[in-house]
Regions:
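Short, solvent-exposed loop/turn segments at secondary-structure junctions
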Residues: 31-33, 67-68, 103-105, 137-139, ...
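N-terminal signal peptide c-region/cleavage motif recognized by signal peptidases
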Residues: 16-18
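Active-site catalytic motif of lipid deacylating hydrolases and related acyltransferases
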Residues: 22-96
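Short, solvent-exposed loop/turn and secondary-structure capping segments
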Residues: 36-40, 110-111, 142-146, 210-212
């Protein structure tokens, strides 16, 4: 009788235990055409550190697409959809966390907001558990306006934004307002996104040469972003106003609320392992 009961409880346990989710991470870069985003955009240190939050730290993919195009372009959202679909199918991913940076947040929002635009979109949305949007350009940036108009900042911003590409046009403030009002969900007055879109907001740039923290992710970039910050609000990461970064979904946190030493995250630093950002992401995963 004891053996019978034991067998019964074992069988019941096997039946009632839910299947473990096969969790994975997709790293989605920002503006620009990437062929090796693992090394050139994120760095292996950042990717590996964040991925330690997974049961299997090898279950990640790093996207390489042409985000110099409009977000809906086949080379942008189409490429992203193809690579995400392959990741989901090849690795049997049932719970995908998408980590985006800058304009990458707009491309994934396009997919989440327009499920009938491409037959691959619904499966991607279903597999996605949440989007962690690092410094997303949800409401655009005045710097895109300046670059598109041929301002003197064009040459100094090329490393960050590109030179007069469609993605630059798209991120002009008035253009993003139009897209948010008509094609993208998650902003004020629009339907909510199908899955959580958690924004991490960068609020300032430090470039003091005597401060070692200014050298994280490259001192020269900090100096450049400190300069461009003069065109932005007092709360900005050198490329985006805080209001733009907070414009879609919900704000998870503003840098100083959680970073080591309450350090700000510039637009360059918010895609690198600076001030425990990688650890914060890892723990959330």
């Amino acid at each position: 009788m004891k053996k019978l009961l034991t067998s019964w409880w074992i069988a019941l346990g096997l039946i009632s235990t839910p299947a473990l989710a096969n969790k994975g991470i997709a790293f989605v870069h920002g503006t620009g055409m990437q062929t090796d985003a693992y090394n050139d955009y994120w760095t292996g240190d950042f990717v590996h550190s964040v991925s330690q939050g997974l049961n299997d730290s090898s279950m990640y993919t790093v996207i390489n697409c042409d985000f110099d195009q409009f977000m809906w372009d086949q080379k942008a959202a189409g490429c992203l959809a193809e690579q995400l679909s392959s990741f989901i199918n090849d690795k049997n991913i049932s719970e995908m966390i998408v980590i985006t940076h800058s304009n990458g947040g707009n491309v994934i929002r396009w997919i989440m907001s327009n499920p009938t635009f491409d037959s691959r979109y619904p499966a991607i949305i279903n597999a996605t558990s949440k989007v962690i949007a690092l410094a997303p350009s949800s409401l655009g940036t005045p710097l895109a306006d300046a670059v598109h108009q041929g301002n003197v900042f064009e040459s100094s911003l090329g490393w960050l934004l590109g030179y007069g590409s469609d993605a630059v046009k798209q991120q002009q403030v008035s253009w993003m307002h139009y897209y948010n009002q008509n094609f993208l969900n998650g902003t004020a007055g629009r339907p909510a996104l199908a899955k959580p879109f958690k924004a991490v907001v960068g609020s300032d740039v430090d470039s003091a040469f005597w401060d070692g923290d200014s050298y994280c992710a490259g001192y020269q970039y900090q100096v450049a972003l400190e300069t461009t910050q003069n065109w932005l609000d007092s709360c900005s990461d050198g490329f985006l106003n805080c209001s733009s970064q907070a414009g879609a979904g919900t704000v998870w946190f503003t840098d100083k609320q959680r970073t080591r030493g309450r350090e700000p995250l510039s637009h360059q630093q918010s895609r690198r392992d600076c001030f425990n950002l990688d650890v914060i992401l890892r723990n959330d995963i």
